[in-house]
């Protein structure tokens, strides 16, 4: 009798995989094991919950029971997997174990919290569960410090500002979105955040946090300090690799997989935020969707390589939204920036005048799909 496929995780990657498997095979045994409730929610919504007045439970789209019934699944929520015996094809928790034919790691990534004194006072918003734990504090907070000016930090800064809170955003870099694009491109959004009232502390460093009678005292470099009611870490994600490491799989930044999503063990695969595909960690929805389609085929006996096209990344800052694609972080590109009242188109070209990247904003985002077609594969 077939032991079927065991998936560790229940987030977007795991669910996309389940849907793609069931399109092709209605009966192969599918078992999902995860530490959370396994209820479905849309993770990008976490960047907008405060301005929209949503509670954690409002985010639930489908309960675990409904999910299991719809797709004929064996679910084990609130279950921590402790070990994988790759040789015996067994997954273990404290009180249970599961035999598998094929195993998929979809363990996601955890929010990185800067290792400063008082780091335990920092909140993270990387899951519905994390939001549920801190939603009262965030709703009641009047003064909010966001640590990190990347994609999530910028989205959160705008959202909290739209909710009427006093927002300070701190980052080591000289501009927001510094790992994604040069300052001359991000300056439009940076200016908009400042106009809205976000206090930007760039080229600045958080040195420690301390609880006070009236809030949290954040100590910064250059003998500065600020008192706030809540501090949110938005300093990036770290792929969850501990389980894979204990199983003896090859690890770099994430769980290393090839173009077939296969790890260094023939019967173990990785998908989503935890996976490093041919040296790249791609924690965005579109590559995860495409990876899930390919992996479903391969788990069912095909041999299909993943081929990723040029893809859009969306920065969901409603007052000034951005779409970007290509190698926007490349240092050697020349940027041709066309700015109008209704939006911006920034083109990054190489020495041969070949388009390598672009960023578009506001009403000019409709030009993204035409530009996308001209990017090299």
From Swiss-Prot:
Keyword flag rRNA-binding: no
Localisation: Cytoplasm
Keywords from the named record: Cytoplasm, FAD, Flavoprotein, NAD, Oxidoreductase
Chemical reaction(s) catalysed: 2 reduced [nitric oxide reductase rubredoxin domain] + NAD(+) + H(+) = 2 oxidized [nitric oxide reductase rubredoxin domain] + NADH
Pfam families in UniProt: Pyr_redox_2 (PF07992), Rbx_binding (PF18113)
EC number: 1.18.1.-
InterPro entries the record matches: FAD-bd_OxRdtase (IPR050260), FAD/NAD-bd_sf (IPR036188), FAD/NAD-binding_dom (IPR023753), NO_rdtase_NorW (IPR023961), Rbx-bd (IPR041364)
Single annotated GO MF: oxidoreductase activity, acting on iron-sulfur proteins as donors, NAD or NADP as acceptor
NCBIfam families assigned: PRK04965.1
HAMAP family xref list: NorW
Family note: Belongs to the FAD-dependent oxidoreductase family.
Function: One of at least two accessory proteins for anaerobic nitric oxide (NO) reductase. Reduces the rubredoxin moiety of NO reductase.
Protein's name in the database: Nitric oxide reductase FlRd-NAD(+) reductase
């Amino acid at each position: 009798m077939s032991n079927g496929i065991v998936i560790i995780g229940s987030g977007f990657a795991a669910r996309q995989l389940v849907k793609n498997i069931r399109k092709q095979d209605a009966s192969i045994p599918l078992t999902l094991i995860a530490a959370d409730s396994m209820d479905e929610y849309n993770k990008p919504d976490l960047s907008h919950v405060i301005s929209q007045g949503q509670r954690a439970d409002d985010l639930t789209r489908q309960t675990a029971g409904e999910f299991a019934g719809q797709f004929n699944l064996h679910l084990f929520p609130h279950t921590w997997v402790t070990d994988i015996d790759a040789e015996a094809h067994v997954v273990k928790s404290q009180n249970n174990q599961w035999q598998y034919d094929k195993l998929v790691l979809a363990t996601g990534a955890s929010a990185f919290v800067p290792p400063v004194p008082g780091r335990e006072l920092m909140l993270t918003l990387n899951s519905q569960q994390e939001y549920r734990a801190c939603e009262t504090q965030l709703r009641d907070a009047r003064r909010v410090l966001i640590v990190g000016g990347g994609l999530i930090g910028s989205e959160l800064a705008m959202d909290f500002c739209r909710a009427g809170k006093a927002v300070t955003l701190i980052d080591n870099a000289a501009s927001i979105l510094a790992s994604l694009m040069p300052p001359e491109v991000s300056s439009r959004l940076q200016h908009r955040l400042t106009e809205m009232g976000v206090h930007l502390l760039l080229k600045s460093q958080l040195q420690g946090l301390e609880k006070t009678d009236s809030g949290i005292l954040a100590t910064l470099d250059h003998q500065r300090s600020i008192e706030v009611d809540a501090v949110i870490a938005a300093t990036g994600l770290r792929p969850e690799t501990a389980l894979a490491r204990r199983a003896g799989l090859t690890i770099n930044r994430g769980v290393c997989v090839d173009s077939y999503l296969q790890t260094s063990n023939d019967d173990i695969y990785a998908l989503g935020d935890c996976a490093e595909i041919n040296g790249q960690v791609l924690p965005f929805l579109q590559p995860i969707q495409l990876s899930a389609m390919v992996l479903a085929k391969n788990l069912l006996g095909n041999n299909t390589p993943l081929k990723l096209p040029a893809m859009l990344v969306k920065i969901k800052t409603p007052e000034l939204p951005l779409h970007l694609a290509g190698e926007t972080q490349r240092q050697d590109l020349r940027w041709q920036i066309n700015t109008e009242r209704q939006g911006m188109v920034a083109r990054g070209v190489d020495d041969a005048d070949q388009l390598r990247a672009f960023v578009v904003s506001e009403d000019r985002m409709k030009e993204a799909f035409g530009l996308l077609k001209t990017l090299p594969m």
